[in-house]
Amino acid sequence: MALAGLPLSVFAIAVHFCLVFSSSSSPPVCPANGHRDRTAYHFQPAKNWQNDPNGPVYYNGMYHLFYQYNPHGALWDVGNLSWGHSVSGDLVNWAALDNALDPTAPFDANGCASGSVTILPDGVPVVMYSGIDARRRQVQNVAFPKNPRDPLLREWTKPGYNPVIPVPADVSPDNFRDPTTAWLGSDGLWRFAISAVADGVGATLVYRSADFLRWERNAAPLHASRDAVMAECPDLFPVAEHGEDGLDLDASAIGGAGAGVRHVLKVSMPDTLEDYYMVGRYDDADDTFTVPPEDLEAHGDDYRRWRRIDHGHLYASKTFYDAGKKRRVLWAWVNESDSEADDVTKGWSGLQSFPRAVWLDEGGRQLVQWPVEEIETLRRKRGVLLGGNEVEAGGLREIGGIAGSQADVEVAFEIASLAGADRLEPDHLRDPDALCGENGAAVHGGIGPFGLLVMASGDLRERTAVFFRVFRLSHGYTVLMCTDLTRSTSRAGVYKPSHGGFVDIDIEKDRAISLRTLIDHSIVESFGGGGRTCMTARVYPEHVATGSSHLYVFNNASDAVKVSKLEAWELATASVNAGDDGLISYGGPVCAAQVQ
């Protein structure tokens, strides 16, 4: 649906979404534009490069996603970075609007970099973003909607008094960016956090303001590392100590150490391309973030030792509060793993992860992430496990009846005994990626590997494995979750690592573990242990050019495992930033269903 020239009301957008998905017929097995790697229900623009999610916000009954976008090509080009903009009524189907921000003024002449959206007390949203100015310094700017009554927020203006925050004298001019969503403290002052390298040390700084225009930096950083690597794309948000409801960034939740509220500080590390977080308490009296002593001792000040948002291919995550459903929702950039030449041929690069609801688990130290419930509106045909629910040692059971390239699968495994668990030495706990690489899906073990084979060819020469292993420690047991990409494609020039992470569950008590996997052509998102350990992967199998993908449950353990639950659904194709003819611009090879 083209938005230009139409009566752009919330009603019109909603009617369009309803008309597109009123049919209950099964979807095609190809993504919307026919390119074999293009996704069917993950967010991506019609063409070109995208990266960080910026300023996701729920405003006047609509979801807005702004994102880093190069409107001129499929590769990263900082000088052309703009803010792309799309709107949705359900976080699944999206309509593209014109760019919200383009590099036009001296204070952002070389790019409109990352930032956030804040809703002011009068209901007007304001963008704060990092501009790269004419001298290539990173400065902080604001922008306002041209018409605040427009529910789609189609046009934005950048005041001439920008930048509102120039580069401080002690801060590196090319390491001062990514302002967070702002919050009002209990003293009535606005605050936001921002990444910087100050006096040669990577730090998360806090600024305060009474009017959102004149800002003063807090004397002490919110948090600082011990080296010069900047922790970028910070996010600070409150979480309830109990329950799954999200909390807004208001004074009652973000300020002080209020009862029933904890806080999460998340950063993205450019040297590892991973997102890390810690659960602690933020106090707006002195703008400090503290963590429990036991966590500080275990993880220290090095961000790379903190917990990971995702143990796979995911970066620059950003959350927002969804007031409509009282939840906190996380977005993140998922980059390509093929070559730049492939991206140029396709005409696009980069996805957003499927939006995830986020809350604090009952232990109070880690986040739980789960796909937002709206994904269920795409469910069509239901799959069945062929051959029974007990999978013998070395067994393989196909999940039949659905298209394996566009699915939502949730499976639970029961383990009768832990007696056969392999021994794991303590030093192997430090590097789960390496442990998964050494113990791939084809390496038989005591309890595990067992899990799913996804995007698999009929002859199994190409397959992506998502699986678990249970290990015995000197003080109990631990569960390792892996995504093995080493056989995901026969194509040359593709990054095919093994991702790994430990799942914080009591396997000795539960004797069961769950896995949910979203499969969408070239992306596989997996959630282990009810969402306590998450892994995102990019896959580019060659077999989809001439045939269909298969989906299996496998078990390479020494004993049988029981599948106590299986819910597998084929998913319809969402309407994501489609053009006038309902299609997406693309290049390169098409998938099998459109070749025939």
Curated annotation (Swiss-Prot):
- Name the domain of life: Eukaryota
Report the locations given in the UniProt record. Secreted, Extracellular space, Apoplast; Secreted, Cell wall
CDD domains this protein is in?
Answer: GH32_Fruct1-like
- What's a single GO MF annotation on this record? beta-fructofuranosidase activity
| GO BP annotations, alphabetical order | carbohydrate metabolic process
* GO cellular component terms, A-Z: apoplast
Glyco sites are at 80, 335, 556
Entry-linked Gene3D superfamilies: Exo-inulinase, domain 1, Glycosyl hydrolase domain, family 43
Instruction: Give me the residues that bind substrate, please.
Output: 49-52, 68, 76, 113-114, 177-178, 232
- Give the Enzyme Commission number: 3.2.1.26
Q: Give the similarity note.
A: Belongs to the glycosyl hydrolase 32 family.
Output this protein's name. Beta-fructofuranosidase, insoluble isoenzyme 6
List the source organism.
Oryza sativa subsp. japonica (Rice)
